[in-house]
Structure formats: C-alpha cells, structure tokens
Swiss-Prot record:
GO terms for molecular function: GTP binding; GTPase activity. It comes from Buchnera aphidicola subsp. Baizongia pistaciae (strain Bp). The lineage of its organism: Bacteria, Pseudomonadati, Pseudomonadota, Gammaproteobacteria, Enterobacterales. Transmembrane segments: none annotated. This is Cell division protein FtsZ. InterPro entries: Cell_div_FtsZ, Cell_div_FtsZ_CS, FtsZ/CetZ, FtsZ_C, Tub_FtsZ_C, Tubulin/FtsZ-like_C, Tubulin/FtsZ_2-layer-sand-dom, Tubulin/FtsZ_GTPase_sf. Gene3D superfamilies: Tubulin/FtsZ, C-terminal domain, Tubulin/FtsZ, GTPase domain.
Length: 385
C-alpha cells in the first residue's frame, strides 16, 4: 500500500556540466527553465566558458592549460580537476544530489568527470552521471578513451546513464536536423533532472521526499531513464511505453531492476485506472524485491497530457552491460512483451529505427568541413551563432 509522505522542500540539486559538451547540455537545460535546480559549467577552456549562457562557471587547470583547453587529452583534464579540487569541493559541499553531464572521449570531460564524481561521493552526496559516447566514425582512439573514462567514472557514481551518439543515427527519423537530433539526446538529461526535481519540490497527491530518491538511486550502478508524454484515452499506457523504451540509451535488459523511481505529472484529472496502468508497467520489468517509489506532481499547464518519468536502477555494473551488449542493438527485445506492439501517436520518430541519418548526409552532399563539426568532442555540438 502506498502512503503519502511529507513533502521536503530542502533538498539541494546541482547539475554540473563538465567540458564543452557538458556545458552545452547544462546551457540547454537553463534555456528550458528547469526549476529547483542549480546549474554549473566547468571547463579548462576559458573562451568556451565566456560564451556559454550559464550563470555559474568554473575554470579549472588554469596553471596547466593556460585557459586553452585539454587538447583531447584526458590526463590533462584529470590533472586540471585535481589542481582545483578545493574549489570544486566548495561548490559541491552543500548539495544533496549532483548530476554530472559530460561527453566521453575528449579531454576535459573524460578526465575531470571521474575526479569531480569522486569528490562528490566523498562528501556523501547522491551522485548520478549522464554521459555520451562518441560516434563510431570519430575513430577507435576516441572510443577507447571514452570507454576508459566511463569505466573510471562508474567507480564513483551511484547511478550511471549512458547515451551512445550512434543511437541518434540508428533511432531517429531520416532527415532530422542535427540540432534536433542532439537536442533529443539532451532531453534525456533534462527528463532525469526535471522528473526528480518535480518529485521532491512540487506538491502532489502522493509526495516523495529526498530520502526515497536516495534509497532508489544510491549505490545502484547502471541505470535506465525515460520520459513519455501522451494525451487522450490511452495516455497512461502510451506515456509508459515511451518512457520504458528509452531507445537512445545504451542497450540494457530491464528485467530484475532493483530500484524504480516513478514520477507521474498531470493536471487534476488523473484517474485511478491510469495509475494502475502505470503501476502494472513497472511490475512487468522490476524485480519482486525491488524498491519502488511512485510520486505524483500536479501541473495545471499539462491540460489533457500526462507525463511519466521512470528511473530504473540496479541493472548491473558498466562492465556487465558492455560485455553483454558488444555492438548489437537489443533495444526492442528489452521492452516488456505486453508493451512491444503498442503504437503511440506521440512518438512517430521511433516507428522505424532502421532509418539512418547518415544516409541523409550522403544524399545531401555533406562536406568534409561539416563532418569535422560532428567530430567536435562534445555532449552536444553547439549551434553556430
């Protein structure tokens, strides 16, 4: 039986974007006006920090890099973070939860993210990382660097969510713009932060406090996160389907998830049977002994829409996932069988995952200069101004 819990408004959530890509991800979230969260951009590149529209920026490693960046060298990124560890500790110390956003494969993000995560964990902060892995065409060296960075990062975070950039090619519709494709990846981080922030800061019929969030996400290893929005008579089923599919994430098997955190956001018109539908979706993949925390957030701006955010944790270590997946795409077979055939009106871009953006590049005659833009080691490539 679910019991209402007193709302806790005191939890401090910080989102730390590391490197050029992580900074871009944080800037995107600032522009999306996520409430109840503090945002920081950390970089070795002074020029990148001057251009970014994030209020709180921190330059690291100025003595090592002279403000010129890490030159795609993770060792430089690591040393830069260690050089400014006291400063980093000061911005983290009062947080209850920290999200780390970074692209893996470059210099600053790959090298500094594990150091910052380590500092956060030593301070007793619930630490969650959302990172990307590079496109295959960015080269074997960058991919190896990314794998090493993720493996090191996984030692110091409570939960880890990975977005392989190649999924943007395999999943999204043919002809989608580059900006929209990268913004779709950015929405994974936004969904996780927004869903958890709303759970503990917005009133609802079933309130959740930060202790519940910590129970589900602490020391859980690999995680899956998804958000779905739908409207109409089947909105609960459709939103759950979208949330649980998470086609942009590293391929994982949800069966046996040890922790599940769910936020349902709607207006005042949510029905009991809709709540049951979402609950049955959770039961379809979680372990019988899983810790399940469900909260609702009221938002009158949702009108007829309903949003479901699901964070499933305790799915295994990063090395377990890497060993099981290799390069094969298993996404569809990991959706619970009772949801596999459901078609949704809200997610037409997922209907044909075999369409390739790369085909569009070839058809449109993308130049070498434009392809070099894709090779920028960033979480999201900054749009040209």
């Amino acid at each position: 039986m679910f019991e209402p819990v007193e709302l806790n408004n005191n939890a401090i959530i910080k989102v730390i974007g590391i490197g050029g890509g992580g900074g871009n991800a944080v800037e995107y979230m600032v522009q999306e006006h996520i409430e109840g969260v503090e945002f920081f951009a950390i970089n070795t590149d002074a020029q990148a920090l001057r251009k970014i529209e994030v209020e709180q920026t921190i330059q690291i490693g100025s003595d090592i890099t002279k403000g010129l960046g890490a030159g795609a060298n993770p060792e430089i990124g690591r040393r830069a973070a260690e050089e400014d560890s006291d400063n980093l500790k000061s911005i983290l110390k009062d947080a209850d939860m920290v999200f780390i956003a970074s692209g893996m494969g470059g210099g600053t993000g790959t090298g500094a993210a594990p150091i910052i995560a380590k500092i956060s964990k030593k301070l007793g902060i619930l630490t969650v990382a959302v990172v990307t892995k590079p496109f295959n065409f960015e080269g074997k060296k960058r991919m190896i660097s990314a794998e090493q960075g993720v493996s090191e990062l996984s030692k110091y975070v409570d939960s880890l969510i990975i977005i392989p950039n190649d999924k943007l090619i395999k999943v999204l519709s043919k002809g989608i713009s580059l900006l929209d494709a990268f913004n779709t990846a950015n929405n994974v981080l936004k969904g996780a932060v927004q869903g958890i922030a709303e759970l503990i800061t917005k009133p609802g019929l079933m309130n959740v406090d930060f202790a519940d969030v910590r129970t589900v996400m602490s020391e859980m290893g690999y995680a899956m996160m998804g958000t779905g929005i739908a409207s109409g008579d089947e909105r609960a089923k459709e939103a759950s389907k979208i949330a649980i599919s998470s086609p942009l994430l590293e391929d994982i098997n949800l069966s046996g998830a040890k922790g599940v955190l769910v936020n349902i956001t709607s207006g005042l018109n949510m029905k009991l049977d809709e709540f049951e539908t979402i609950g049955n979706t959770i039961r379809s993949f979680s372990s019988d002994n899983a810790t399940v925390v469900i909260g609702t957030s009221l938002d009158t701006n949702m009108n007829d829409s309903l949003r479901v955010t699901i964070v499933a944790t305790g799915i295994g270590t990063y090395n377990d996932i890497k060993h099981n997946n290799n390069t094969e795409n298993h996404t569809s077979k990991h959706v619970p069988k009772n949801l596999e055939n459901l078609q949704t009106k809200e997610s037409p871009k997922y209907n044909n995952p075999k369409q390739h953006i790369y085909d569009t590049f070839n058809q449109q005659g993308i130049t070498n200069k434009e392809m070099n833009y894709l090779d920028i080691p960033a979480f999201l490539r900054k749009k040209h101004k």
